[in-house]
Amino acid sequence: MPDNEVHALFIGWAEARISDRRANAVFRRMAARSGIDRRWSVLAPPPHGTQVVGGFYDGAMPSTAARMAVYAEEAPRLALRAIGQLGPLGRISHIVVASCTGFVAPGIDQIIARALGLPGDVERTLVGFMGCYAAVAALRVAHHIVRSGPDARVLVVMVELTTLHLQGDTEIEPLLGMLQFGDGAGAAIVSAERAGLAMDRFFAATLPDSHDLIRWTIADEGFVMALSGEVPGRIADALADSATRATIVGPGPVDAWAVHAGGRSVLDAVERGLELPATALADSRAVLATCGNMSSATLMFVLARMMAGKRVDNGVAVAFGPGLAAEGFGFRSAA
């Protein structure tokens, strides 16, 4: 994660923008119930920040080009920090990078490879603009690479700078949407070695008539998130459907759930739709509390907590994003 904690600062910034007293009270109440205690940003608060107050833009909103300039500098830096936590990388044959919060060319995959001193014949894949379930797509690509060539060692990286896309809204709904998001990066090595978590049974399920419920649009002043209030209810209904549930749950009893921490209401919907006990999503709720929603990087944080915990015999990882779709995979402790 970055060094700048911004959750409380954002709440103060947002409250100052809501002129209606009743709406302001609703915002404060919803913020208190969000399940989020801390979020982090690459944007530094004063006195180190320049165009920002409390870690966020002040006054005129910067152009998309200005935000992409920050992304080009900060995203590789945060990704390399996450990679550094893996320890010695050893031989790397492939690199797969997922990010939906910025664009730069040469790509962030090339920037990371060059910074790590990887040889020029390392094969690269960039998963872009998929949203919160991009971690699943990146891990799926790595999984198939290793299945095709068991000697492969794939470096997988997710890096998201969601706070770059703060908008100048004064209405409560978009401000509550922005309340959830923070910056973060996660990394892993996918190989045929018997260590960590073993992945299998990748799946996808797109909900019918839901394509407008989550939108991520490139605008003149950053990327704009539109998140319908219908999303949690539609997720709960879909998970209660026997066919969708069978796709996600798979053949056996599940002893661990790694659910993308997309917000308290989303986690509540998953818990309700799958009829899970209150403790089943404890790791996801812990990540939400300490980091917020970091888009594709979030699931990596949940999986890291599970790797540090008890043995998993039949786990399911799942994330939700534009479509509206669920993507995920089965996993178990490898050793």
Regions found by a protein language model. Give the residues of each.
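Active-site glycine-rich loop that binds ribose-phosphate moieties when present
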Residues: 120-121, 127, 134-141, 158-184
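Short, well-ordered amphipathic alpha-helical segments that serve as non-catalytic structural scaffolds
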Residues: 35-36, 74-87, 141, 185, ...
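Claisen-condensing/thiolase-fold acyl-transfer catalytic domains that form or cleave C-C bonds
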Residues: 100-101, 119-121, 126-147, 236, ...
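Condensing-enzyme catalytic core mediating Claisen C-C bond formation in acyl metabolism
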Residues: 1-70, 168-237, 241, 245, ...
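A contiguous, well-structured pocket-lining segment that forms one wall/lid of small-molecule binding clefts
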Residues: 66, 70, 81-84, 215-288
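Conserved beta-ketoacyl condensing-enzyme motif
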Residues: 36-118, 129, 252-267
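Short beta-strand segments
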Residues: 98, 128, 153-160, 182, ...
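Active-site-adjacent elements of ketosynthase-type condensing enzymes
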Residues: 104-110, 156-176, 203-219, 264-272, ...
